[in-house]
Amino acid sequence: MVKLVFARHGESEWNKANLFTGWADVDLSEKGTQQAIDAGKLIKEAGIAFDLAFTSVLKRAIKTTNLALEYSDQLWVPVEKSWRLNERHYGGLTGKNKAEAAEQFGDEQVHIWRRSYDVLPPDMAKDDEHSAHTDRRYAHLDHSVIPDAENLKVTLERALPFWEDKIAPALVDGKNVFVGAHGNSIRALVKHIKQLSDDEIMNVEIPNFPPLVFEFDDKLNLTAEYYLGGE
């Protein structure tokens, strides 16, 4: 029986301020840092030993991963970073206050952008200060694959190759895996793992804390799902 532990990053400064974050590289808040530490403590209490870990290229997920591994006494575990585990790109909504966006565009439209599976928000301008097109961490990517906005469908299309090439093979190989990522990149992978419908995934929320555990048999059939700490 192998374990896959998903840890959404702890609360970020923009979570705290109720802003759309997406690919903006925002740091953890004080509360978020403590959530990551507590995640590590829960992992240690549960006796979960990891063989490898994966995270995004955004600091809130990287720091959460490092803290969770440190406080579970597993900081030595190899960590691979990938843009494919980044949060969903919120396009032109990035940096906007969610309540103010609802006032500007209407509650219903913002709800559709946030929760529908396949409706895209407005594109981010190429010259936006948060544009990935001018960010050095994405310099190895062809501009055609760098998004200007994403819905959950596109987020899954981006994350799925990483699941198929890295995460799933490790699990099949009998390895326990930690994934420190983001609300929507985790939701996308959960949709795939559980084969949820487009409508079903709309009601799935991934909290900043505690970590979510999936257990699989040797054929990668899901056998158990639970949050650490009993939540």
Swiss-Prot record:
Keywords: Gluconeogenesis, Glycolysis, Isomerase. GO terms for molecular function: phosphoglycerate mutase activity. Disulfide bonds: none annotated. It holds the Pfam family His_Phos_1. It is an enzyme of class 5 (isomerase). Its EC number is 5.4.2.11. SUPFAM superfamilies: Phosphoglycerate mutase-like. It catalyses: (2R)-2-phosphoglycerate = (2R)-3-phosphoglycerate. The record marks 182 as: Transition state stabilizer. One of its GO terms (biological process) is glycolytic process. The keyword Isomerase applies. It comes from the Bacteria. Pathway: Carbohydrate degradation; glycolysis; pyruvate from D-glyceraldehyde 3-phosphate: step 3/5. Belongs to the phosphoglycerate mutase family. BPG-dependent PGAM subfamily. This is 2,3-bisphosphoglycerate-dependent phosphoglycerate mutase. The gene is gpmA.
